[in-house]
């Protein structure tokens, strides 16, 4: 039940408007899992349709419930094989709770993109740390918690990183306004734990999008810290059309600013 929740109503309306999804035929074999904030119903099979780029994509929908059984959020989920890999890594490293929060954040981020929610993208790429649990991202007053160090001369400097973030947001705002269809996917998606620093993770994704008249690809890196009361993102970088592995920003580029 979510009929009296304006947030969920607005979100599912935009998900449907921009992705024209339909529930897939056949039996629904969904999973119910405990989460950081409540419960989730995972693996509802749907199909998204993007007519102007001649694309149909199989997707999973994830419903989030509070402890009283009320739906408080809805997102497109990552595919089952990738999700299973992250569960296995979390069980092996005894940190599935942290990895689950990261997975669910990525699902919220991708859903915001596919729903053309520029406000959430603006929050994600803010200079301040951002709390990533909850239905919306919340900025904090914390800045410069981590220090960036280039590992080689092929990696970008801080000014270039800021420029590419700003350009990325400008491009997305234009795309969201001008394109009939937009699809966002990932060619790679990795979660890494920082050595010798508890509860700090790097998230790297090779992200691509197709739209009615334009397509692009790039490398997105996020640093997530679980050492505060609520998990936060401190670092985010976007490297458009970067293929050189030596130039990619990694978790090893960052250390606590002491």
Q: Which positions does each model-derived feature cover?
A:
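Short, low-complexity N-terminal intrinsically disordered segments enriched in polar/charged residues
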Residues: 69-115, 123
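Extracytoplasmic/secreted proteins, especially bacterial periplasmic and envelope-associated proteins
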Residues: 7, 11, 97, 101-104, ...
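Sec-exported extracytoplasmic/periplasmic mature domains
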Residues: 110-114, 126, 130, 173-181
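Short, well-ordered alpha-helical segments enriched in acidic and aromatic residues
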Residues: 1-18, 116-136, 140-144
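Surface-exposed, charged secondary-structure patches
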Residues: 7-64, 145-216
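Acidic/histidine-rich, surface-exposed loop or edge segments in extracytoplasmic proteins
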Residues: 1, 90, 103, 140-156
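Short, solvent-exposed aromatic-acidic interface loops
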Residues: 75-85, 208-211, 235-251
């Amino acid at each position: 039940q979510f009929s009296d929740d304006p947030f969920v109503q607005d979100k599912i309306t935009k998900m449907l408007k921009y992705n024209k999804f339909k529930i897939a035929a056949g039996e629904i074999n969904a999973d119910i899992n405990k989460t950081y904030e409540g419960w989730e119903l995972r693996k509802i099979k749907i199909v998204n349709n993007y007519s102007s780029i001649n694309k149909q994509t199989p997707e999973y929908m994830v419903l989030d419930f509070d402890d009283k059984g009320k739906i408080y959020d809805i997102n497109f989920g990552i595919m089952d094989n990738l999700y299973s890999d992250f569960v296995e890594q979390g069980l092996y490293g005894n940190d599935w709770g942290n990895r689950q929060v990261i997975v669910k954040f990525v699902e919220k981020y991708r859903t915001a993109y596919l729903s053309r929610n520029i406000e959430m993208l603006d929050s994600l790429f803010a200079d301040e740390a951002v709390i990533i649990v909850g239905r919306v991202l919340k900025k904090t007053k914390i800045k410069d918690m981590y220090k960036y160090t280039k590992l080689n001369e092929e990696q970008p400097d801080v000014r270039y990183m800021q420029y590419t973030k700003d350009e990325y947001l400008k491009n997305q705002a234009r795309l969201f306004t001008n394109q009939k269809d937009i699809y966002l996917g990932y060619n790679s998606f990795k979660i890494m734990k920082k050595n010798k620093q508890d509860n700090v993770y790097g998230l790297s994704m090779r992200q691509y999008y197709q739209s009615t008249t334009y397509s692009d690809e790039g490398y997105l890196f996020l640093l997530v810290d679980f050492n505060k009361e609520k998990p936060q993102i401190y670092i985010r970088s976007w490297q458009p059309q970067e293929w050189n592995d030596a130039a990619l920003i990694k978790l090893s580029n960052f250390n606590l600013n002491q």
